[in-house]
Regions:
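Conserved, mostly hydrophobic/aromatic
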Residues: 13, 42, 46, 91, ...
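Conserved anion-binding
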Residues: 15-22, 57-58, 104, 115-197
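Glycine-rich, proline-tolerant flexible connector loops at the mouths of alpha/beta enzymes
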Residues: 19-23, 48-75, 193-199
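Glycine-rich anion/phosphate-binding loops
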Residues: 21-41, 67-71, 115, 119, ...
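Catalytic domains of carbohydrate-active enzymes, especially glycoside hydrolases
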Residues: 37-53
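Conserved beta-strand positions in the central sheet of alpha/beta enzyme cores
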Residues: 48-51, 89, 110-111, 133-134, ...
């Protein structure tokens, strides 16, 4: 894709039963077909990229194993790849899941932990020569608050300088990618709105 020429639209396909946005598809016997229909609708609506994830990042969600994640995402990637001609992003922080997803037809990796959770992830991305979305994330899975209007949310972390700290920590993730041999032109940065930040901090980022 020619980066920088325009804004690209990503359609999110949650192959989970417990999505943050309430649209998890991994329920019922025909959930793979449901995911394909959603992908087709995204394509018809003008999406440029499809992002497929198998582990919920919603506040209070329970972690799953790599085997469970693979069982959710691989059938969807395979089926979507056969029916929709759009690049597929695999939303995972696990190197072995990313590797299998890329082999199944994904085009890039979206890591919500910015290469910090799995030491092999940067190497997998470098070997594949694919784009990598590096997200800033200080959230702690069990550090969750419930609010009447907002529902569950991650509790904001302490920042000495919100923008400066995020830039510094993203640079650390960039350095991990570059050290592994990832091409700088393939790195996409995500400031992590909603992850380990208060509502006010999220507004400041936006």
């Amino acid at each position: 894709m020619p980066w920088g020429q325009r804004t690209y639209i990503m359609g999110i396909i949650n192959a989970t039963p417990d999505s943050f946005s309430g649209d998890g598809l991994a329920v019922g016997a025909d959930w793979v077909e449901t995911a394909v229909r959603q992908a087709q609708q995204f394509a018809a609506d003008g999406a440029d990229i499809l992002d497929i994830g198998g582990e919920s990042t919603r506040p209070g969600s329970q972690p799953i194993t790599a085997e469970e994640e693979l069982a959710r995402v691989l059938p969807v990637i395979t089926a979507v790849r056969q029916s929709v001609n759009l690049p597929i992003s695999i939303d995972t922080y696990r190197a072995n899941v990313a590797e299998a997803a890329l082999q199944a037809g994904a085009s890039w990796v979206n890591d919500v932990w910015g290469l910090r959770m799995d030491g092999r992830m940067a190497d997998v991305v470098a070997k594949a020569g694919c784009p990598i979305v590096i997200m800033h994330n200080r959230s702690k899975p069990k550090n969750v608050a419930q609010e009447e209007k907002l529902g569950g949310r991650y509790v904001g972390m302490e920042y000495g300088d919100l923008i400066g700290d995020i830039k510094r920590e993203l640079q650390e993730s960039i350095d991990l990618a570059l050290a592994a041999g990832v091409d700088a032109s393939q790195i996409i940065l995500d400031p992590g709105v909603g992850f380990g930040k208060t509502v006010e901090q999220n507004r400041q980022l936006i």
